[in-house]
Amino acid sequence: MCGIIGFMSRKKRMIKGDKIALALDSLKERGNGKGSGYVGYGIYPTKYKDCYAFHILIDNTPKFEKIKVEVENVLEQYGTIVKDEEIPTEDGIIEKTQIPWRYFYEVDEKFADREEDVVVDIVMEINDKIDGAFVISSGKDLGVFKAVGWPDEVAKFYRIDKYEGYMWLAHARYPTNTRAWWGGAHPFNLLNWSVVHNGEITSYGTNKRFVEMFGYKCRLLTDTEVVAYILDLLMRKHKIPVEYALSALAPRFWDEIDKMPEEERELHTAIRLAYGGAMLNGPFAIAVGTPQGLIFMNGDIEKDTTMFGLTDRIKLRPLIAAEKDDMIFISSEESAIRRICPDLDRVWMPDAGMPVIARPWK
């Protein structure tokens, strides 16, 4: 159930959206037409590159204008709307129950010391308090495009082929525990974190309570939402190195920890004890993308793009990785990768619970 695909150019070459749409369409049998979505990084390279790009879905009802004003009132409390417009779409492809709107936005200078926290607060306030609107992406130079529909329908609806990005993630949904609606489609995004997920997170209740202790609010009725918030908490707010943050999500088994060298054993024990509420149980495979985030790697701080994939500790959901020149791919199935890149340099199956981490070349 569910199909995921992601790729990144480590040279940061711009790649048209028709590539990700074609790859996801080959995974459509893993979904059931009840949700598909895409996220592109680097899609706003012009004068809005340094603005937060809020993609917001607003109910397509007679209350649309009223809801839109409520959204703008929240935004204007904390900063300036530089530009806003309806996201271009094609008519007659899917039922347009939501109107996708985007705001290019600058946070007020008085919040400069906590700018990203303010953006998170805005997202939580809109999703929690405004009936009929929800934020689907809120990062810089990126955008999420999702809806109820098959992969090719959603791609045509949003004109994905008109966008170019250096990294793309996409998802074909097969909902099992919640109803199909636009907000429940993947990817899930917060700031520069974007998550696509195949499987079921049976620990959702525990994970939800854990992030809510830190002010996050889960309102989109699906387990994947909480993963984006956990990543933001661990890596942005708590500044935990990416490998150790992912170890909190899929920690080593206790018998493995017992066999580690002392320093490593103490570290993994501390992660399990301090971040037990972040541990994901159940069968899952996730792919995550983020640019411009502070990622601690081997003691060094990098401010650049990172894409990674991760499965549960016994790999109950598939995840395939591949490389070709500067390109790296992550997918549920090798066939989706070969649909857009038939001649690969390397293909491998990541070990259970072990991440694949891709960074741009320098």
UniProtKB/Swiss-Prot annotation:
Task: Name the source organism.
Answer: Methanocaldococcus jannaschii (strain ATCC 43067 / DSM 2661 / JAL-1 / JCM 10045 / NBRC 100440) (Methanococcus jannaschii)
Mind telling me which CDD domains this protein's record contains? Answer: GlxB
Pfam families per the record?
GATase_2 (PF00310)
Active-site positions, per UniProt?
A: 2 (for gatase activity)
List the keywords (alphabetical). Answer: Glutamine amidotransferase
What positions does the domain Glutamine amidotransferase type-2 occupy? 2-362
What protein am I looking at? Uncharacterized protein MJ1351.1
